[in-house]
């Protein structure tokens, strides 16, 4: 198996949509039940900072975050890794690279949301220094405070 190559902001909206569809059964609640994937992929491609994992020219992992320079708050909108690339640290590598990028941009905090019932994802985020900051229905809000880097 080829090693994962990490790129930033290189995936097209079509590649992102294809990746999200391929990951749909990995999510606790199917992504297609929550968003319109083509529109979501287009928004990510246009507005998010994307840290991408590629293997054999196929997008196997994606962490996408929006950054508001005025508030210095980043929001991770997507963390997804194909089943074939899970369990070998791919998601952690991509998440840490995203955190580093947000800190370089000046983020003082990084936020994300996760389904309360998704124990695997919750543990993953706790392992990466995110803490619970609130609840909205069955959605757990998490935050990581950052040291800014320049």
PLM regions and their residue ranges:
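Acetyl-CoA-dependent GNAT
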Residues: 3-77, 82, 95-96, 101, ...
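Generic structural motif
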Residues: 11, 56, 84, 117, ...
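Loop/helix-junction capping segments adjacent to catalytic residues or to phosphate/diphosphate-binding pockets
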Residues: 14, 88, 119
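Base-recognition residues in the alpha-helical recognition helix of bacterial helix-turn-helix
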Residues: 78, 86, 114
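Conserved acetyl-CoA-binding loop-helix of GNAT-fold acetyltransferases
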Residues: 81, 87-100, 123-127
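Short coil/turn segments at alpha/beta junctions that flank glycine-rich nucleotide-binding fingerprints
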Residues: 88, 105-108
């Amino acid at each position: 198996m080829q090693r994962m190559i990490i790129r930033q902001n290189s995936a097209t909206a079509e590649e992102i949509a294809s990746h999200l569809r391929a990951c749909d059964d990995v999510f606790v609640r199917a992504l297609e039940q929550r968003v319109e994937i083509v529109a979501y992929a287009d928004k990510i491609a246009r507005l998010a900072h994307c840290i991408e994992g590629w293997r054999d020219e196929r997008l196997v992992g994606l962490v996408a975050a929006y950054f508001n320079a005025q508030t210095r708050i980043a929001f991770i909108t997507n963390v997804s890794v194909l089943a074939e690339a899970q369990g070998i640290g791919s998601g952690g590598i991509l998440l840490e690279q995203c955190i580093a990028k947000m800190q370089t941009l000046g983020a003082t905090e990084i936020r994300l949301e996760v389904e309360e019932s998704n124990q695997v994802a919750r543990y993953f985020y706790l392992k990466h220094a995110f803490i619970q900051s609130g609840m909205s229905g069955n959605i757990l809000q998490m935050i990581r405070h950052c040291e800014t880097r320049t």
